[in-house]
């Protein structure tokens, strides 16, 4: 993920809406997955941005899970993680890397849309399967949600793709 898509200017009421949305997603997962059996957790696409209540929200909510692992192309300094691989989820993984971060529960929250082509998306899913022992969750942004969740700007993502991408470069 590129850092340029994350707006540093957040609006409190919008962050509350985003946080509420992430809380609903956490509740959905909690209803569907027996988290009491989960001993290790892998977050795909962890962000280095910890400045806002909605940043890495699920990682914080899963604090009762003993082992937290992360894969990110960003530099993650958070001490919450037991193991961090700084690489793309579409990269090839060695047997040692797989064994190091393979987890009971693997989640990708709004990452798959950043890996590019359909081929890369398939590679990401294939890698996630290799890195997951029991449960794998892939979530992507709902295009019809009124707030663009990376920049936290209302309606930005409804612009034509070319204008949207151009505007992201200025943020």
Which residue ranges define each predicted feature?
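Conserved SAM-binding loop
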Residues: 32, 39-145
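A structural signal for well-ordered alpha-helical scaffolds and beta->alpha junctions
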Residues: 18, 22-26, 51, 55, ...
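A conserved mid-domain beta-alpha-beta active-site/ligand-binding segment of alpha/beta enzyme cores
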Residues: 166-171
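Transmembrane helix-loop junctions in multipass membrane proteins, especially transporters and channels
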Residues: 58-59, 154, 165
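Short, structured coil/loop segments at alpha-helix boundaries
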Residues: 4-12, 79, 94-95, 101, ...
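Class I SAM-dependent methyltransferase Rossmann-like catalytic core
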Residues: 1-36
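Conserved class I S-adenosyl-L-methionine
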Residues: 135-162
């Amino acid at each position: 993920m590129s850092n340029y898509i994350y707006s540093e200017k957040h609006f409190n009421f919008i962050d509350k809406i985003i946080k509420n949305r992430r809380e609903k997603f956490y509740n959905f997962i909690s209803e569907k997955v027996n988290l009491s059996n989960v001993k290790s957790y892998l977050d795909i696409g962890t962000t280095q941005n910890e400045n806002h209540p909605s940043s890495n929200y699920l990682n914080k909510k899963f604090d009762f899970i003993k082992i937290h692992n992360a894969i990110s192309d960003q530099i993650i300094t958070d001490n919450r993680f037991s193991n961090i691989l700084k690489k793309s989820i579409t990269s090839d993984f060695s047997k040692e890397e797989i064994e190091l971060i393979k987890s009971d529960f693997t989640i990708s929250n709004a990452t798959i849309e950043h890996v590019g082509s359909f081929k890369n998306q398939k590679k990401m899913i294939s890698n996630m399967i290799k890195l997951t022992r029991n449960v794998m969750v892939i979530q992507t942004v709902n295009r019809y949600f009124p707030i663009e969740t990376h920049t936290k700007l209302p309606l930005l993502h409804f612009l034509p793709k070319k204008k949207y991408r151009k505007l992201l470069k200025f943020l």
